[in-house]
Amino acid sequence: MKYLKFTTALVTIAFFSCSQNEAITTNSPDKNIKVDVTLSEKGALTYKITHKNSEVIKTSKLGFDLEGIPSLKENFEIINTTNSSFNETWQMPWGEQLDVVNNYNELKVELQETSALKRKLNIVFRVYNDGVGFRYEFPEQENLSEVLITEEHTEFNLTGDHKVWWIPGDWDIYEHLYNTTKLSEIDALQFANHENLAQTYIPNNAVNTPVTMKTESGLHISFHEASLVDYSGMTLQVDTENNALKSVLVGSENTSYKVKQTAPFNTPWRTIQIAENAGELIESNLIVNLNEPNKLGDVSWFKPTKYTGIWWEMHLGKSSWDMASGKHGATTENTKAFIDFSAKNNIGAVLVEGWNTGWEHWIGFEDREGVFDFVTPYPDYDLEEVVRYGKEKGVEIVMHHETSAATETYEKQQDTAYALMQSLGIHSVKTGYVGKILPKGEYHHGQYMVNHYNNTIIKAANYQVAINAHEPIKATGLRRTYPNTISREGLRGQEFNAWASDGGNPPEHLPIVAFTRMLAGPIDYTPGIFDIKFDKWKKDNQVNTTIAQQLALYVVIYSPVQMAADLIENYEGNPALQFINDVGVDWQETKVLNGEIGDFVTIARKERGSENWFVGGITDENARTIEIDFSFLDAETTYEAIIYEDGRDAHWDNNPTSLAIRKLEISNKSKETFKLAEGGGFAISLKRK
């Protein structure tokens, strides 16, 4: 596949001298967003951002504290500035769309201390039509070689007490419910302990990113980071009195610094997505565009796919991961049943969890190193036979590597484990990192684990293996650079509905996720639960949506690997299964048709390699009526639409399986009205006639 479609020439103008108090400016290509950079009287570098002449970020400072030497925050002079422009269209090997426009104006500001040390630091701003990214560059220099960062001081001073959708700044896990408050009302420390989380650490009143806000004027802004490599993850500490955020890097109990680097190096990009409506946030490509181009070349060995698997039954308690319980789920017989079902229903893969030895001692113990063996199956699971049988049926096995957060054990076995996969023709693995990180004192989002996750991706690519990571580092767009980074969890997923003591994910959860976590990248949410109440297995839990919303999630919550997560017996004979059979997983283009954060969202996606479109819409706990304008469809073309929608009496709690299915002809002149039940949704397949 040709990834680079066209690129305009880079045009650069350098200014080698400027007034130290004069604002240096760059704009977005459409001139709507402007960045002003200045030096304060104390020589601190500051920036501010405006959108259509209204401030978005007030004057905010930048800098670092370093271990054992003076900080890099003040006493700077500007020694050079460079403005440039760039415009290209590149192609995603898989993704929400094929063609991605990467068009920005760049400002590079080169600083040097006025003190005797004369240390240098550069700041690079890239301004797009959909937001701003900036990063620090530590150039090679005599007076600063090894860099030990104790804290990064990146400020985001806001213009008001915005409405915020946030989760706490947990150094270990992203599996919290989202909160909706004013910025001044954020209290992350109230979530410092949670009985359903295997690991959690919230040291500050901070939030994790992406964190999304809406101003009183209706502007939408979201803060995150891009290209997180060899650095610690960033949380944002909240100043509730002054309406401000400031970076707090994830640390380690094993070092007094948070980042160790050697110049020259760059930090991750700090990103601010800016949109006039909520849907534009989802359509933004700022995060992926700030990452380096594909370093792997041809990755056609990975095929986006739907999958079933031995997973949900463990969360329900029907079976278990280990053999000692007497209810082992990962048997040859059970796997073949899933292969047969998948082959009949246009589903390309089967995930098998609990196949390998070690599950009897995987969680709740300090001595977890050496527990898992990533090549040795349990006696009742014939790995070679299920792979052979799957190939016969056209179904690939998805490998599973739960590490129990014992990183050294996994690193020692990776070559052997990936070589086994390659020899069997298995091209994807779901990894897991449940529990506190070993070695002790490290956190899931610190530099140690950032490097572990990224090195795992690179090593796996050498064996043509793609990674779907659970308990991962946050997504920051590295799927562009390493497109074997296919999906990840990194949010409170479907499994919480099976056993969470708080009753699972409320109906507003996913209408928030679409505008927060999903801005970072693909989500392995595992939709498609048809037995919403599952009273046979659990009396106090359920999925808090209608079945129509479960179908809609295949379109709304993006991932190139989408699970049909329920038990086989809950699918068989159910006409709703046809949508899972039909729906695509790889997209030519994506359009957000409407949406408000935490309330509702409707997304349309066109399948690659066909002329078919699919539409999904979901709502929170409130019923609503939505009109869809189908003008996005091809002109002078008729489509056969199959609509799966909430029944008249549907309700996420009282009657979640009430579903109506109807067919009609649709064209780009059509408009249709859909009634969404409380916690409901609708899904549409549109096949060109």
Annotate the PLM regions:
Residues 597-637, 682-685:
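Carbohydrate-binding surface patches
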Residues 109, 566-614, 651-655:
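Glycan-recognition and catalytic regions of carbohydrate-active enzymes
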Residues 1-25:
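Bacterial Sec-dependent N-terminal signal peptides
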Residues 258-341, 345, 349:
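An acidic-aromatic substrate-binding cleft motif
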Residues 354-537, 541-542, 546:
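Aromatic- and carboxylate-enriched substrate-binding clefts and catalytic-loop regions
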Residues 136, 342, 467, 556, ...:
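Conserved, mostly hydrophobic/aromatic
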Residues 663-689:
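C-terminal beta-strand-rich structural cap/linker in extracellular carbohydrate-active enzymes
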Residues 23-296, 658:
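N-terminal accessory beta-strand-rich subdomains and adjacent acidic, glycine-rich linkers
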